[in-house]
Structure formats: C-alpha cells, structure tokens
C-alpha cells in the first residue's frame, strides 16, 4: 500500500519511488482483520475442491489479477497518462493504435525475456513444478506473508528497483516508439517499481516450474493484465477522470491485492498439507 506522495514527474531523469510510511485510514483495523480472516477461510475452503491440476489455473488467475492491480503503481499511472492519443475524436484514436500495438509488443517481449530467464533458473536448479509439496508450501508462505503485508498487519521486505521509466524518451522518439520502449521496460517487471507483491508469487511460480514455456506463460499473463488498462484511452474519457478514479481506488486496490494473496496462500497451504 505505497503512497504516491513522493512521486516526482520531472522529465529527463529516472524517478525514484520512496517507501510508504503512512497508510490511509479508509479501512479500519477490524475491517482489514475481517478481510484477512475471510480471505484465508475462503482460500482454505476452495482448496477442498482443488487438486494439483487446478494449481496452474489459480496461478494464472492470480497473475492476471496482479497485472491489473499493478496499474496502481507509479508507472501504471504514468503509462496511461503519457501514452494517451494526441487530440480528440476517432481520427486521434486511429492514429494512436500503432502506439497501443507497440506497447503490447513490448510487454510480450519482456515476458519472453523474463520468463525464459526464470524458467531456465528453475530448470538448472532441478525444480520440477509448482504443484509439488515444496512448491505449494513456498507459494503458500509468500501468499500469506505478503497478504498480511498488503493488509498492513506485517512488514515484509519488498526488494525492487525503486525507479520509473525515463520520461525524456517521449521528447526524443515518436510516440509509437515510446510505447514499445515503455512496454518492454514495464514488461520486464523488475526494472521499475511494481506495487503488487503478486509479482513475487508469479515469479516464484515461474522459477518453480523449471520449464521455460510455463514460466513465459505465467509472466505473459501477468503482463497482459498490466497492458490492458492502457486500452481505457480508447474511450472518450479525460486523463483527469482516469487519474482521479485510480486515486480514489488506490487503497481498495491494495486491499484486493492482500485478499487475493491471502486466499491463494491459504489454498496452497491446505494443498501442501494434504
């Protein structure tokens, strides 16, 4: 649940992202505790109807949700704002479609690179899949720990490169080129600050798979969730309306993040112990 209070939009530099030290009070401690308990109970109950074959489906859904929730990161706000069509009307939207396309291609390339690296690491380490007892146990710990982190009951290390894409690129290249560069930078997922620990869950699953194809697929699903929100620029809404809506729902996004992590962690814990 990081704040954007210290988010610097100055062009011509890579922006730093400071840690959050204060949290909005929209959700009381009791409310967050109830969400934590309900999520854990829901995940545990769901595990009763699951087997190893369902693990990949759950991870895929969690990856997509994580990608969507990463919109509430500094780069999520920025990519929607900075890659907007120039002008108004149907013609402006048509002229913007190449930017939208190259942005998606950048995300796809990022998924291919990162997924290949993670899958190869798992393969070299001799890991044989995320549905093993060890794999499920590790994913359960990550989900439960970072779920409590997002719900502000636990402080867990959050190692990331606290930086943003360099804004001066839009001064030097056509917008469709910038779209591709931003997509690649964001699609590598660890070059910029991503405000959802679901990325760690997906990363761990990709390594645990020990399989390049499965790892690429997981990262691609996460990146698809990151990419699609930019499509809001196809709609007749202003940048102010979009940014205001994101700002109003910042805390809700963090709560949803924590609930998903907790539910997935509880489900995988039950499967690991079965």
Curated annotation (Swiss-Prot):
Main location as per UniProt: membrane
Compartment(s): Cell membrane
GO CC annotations, alphabetized: plasma membrane
Stretches that traverse the bilayer: 30-50, 52-72, 105-125, 127-147, 176-196, 202-222, 253-273
Cysteines engaged in disulfide bonds, as pairs: none
Keyword Nuclease: no
Keywords, alphabetical: Cell membrane, Membrane, Transmembrane, Transmembrane helix
Listed name of the protein: Methylamine utilization protein MauF
Organism field: Paracoccus versutus (Thiobacillus versutus)
Record lineage: Bacteria, Pseudomonadati, Pseudomonadota, Alphaproteobacteria, Rhodobacterales
């Amino acid at each position: 649940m990081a704040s954007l209070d210290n988010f610097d939009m100055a062009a011509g530099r890579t922006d730093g992202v400071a840690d959050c030290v204060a949290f909005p009070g929209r959700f009381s401690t009791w409310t967050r505790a109830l969400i934590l308990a309900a999520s854990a109970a829901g995940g545990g109950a769901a595990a009763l109807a699951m087997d190893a074959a369902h693990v990949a489906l759950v991870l895929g859904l969690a990856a997509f949700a994580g990608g969507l929730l990463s919109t509430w990161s500094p780069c999520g706000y920025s990519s929607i704002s900075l890659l907007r069509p120039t002008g108004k009307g149907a013609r402006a939207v048509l002229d913007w479609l190449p930017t939208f396309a190259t942005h998606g291609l950048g995300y796809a390339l990022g998924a291919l690179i990162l997924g290949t690296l993670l899958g190869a690491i798992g393969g070299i380490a001799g890991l044989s899949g995320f549905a093993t007892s060890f794999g499920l146990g590790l994913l359960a710990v990550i989900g439960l720990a970072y779920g409590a982190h997002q719900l502000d009951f636990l402080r867990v290390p959050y190692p990331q490169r606290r930086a943003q894409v360099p804004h001066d690129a839009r001064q030097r290249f056509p917008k469709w080129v910038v779209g591709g560069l931003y997509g690649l930078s964001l699609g590598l997922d660890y070059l910029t600050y991503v405000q959802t620990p679901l990325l760690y869950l997906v990363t761990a699953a990709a390594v645990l798979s020990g399989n390049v194809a499965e790892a690429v697929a997981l990262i691609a699903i996460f990146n698809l969730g990151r990419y699609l929100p930019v499509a809001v620029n196809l709609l007749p809404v202003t940048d102010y309306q979009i940014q205001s809506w994101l700002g109003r729902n910042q805390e809700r996004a963090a709560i949803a993040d924590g609930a998903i992590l907790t539910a997935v962690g509880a489900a995988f814990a039950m499967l690991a112990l079965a």
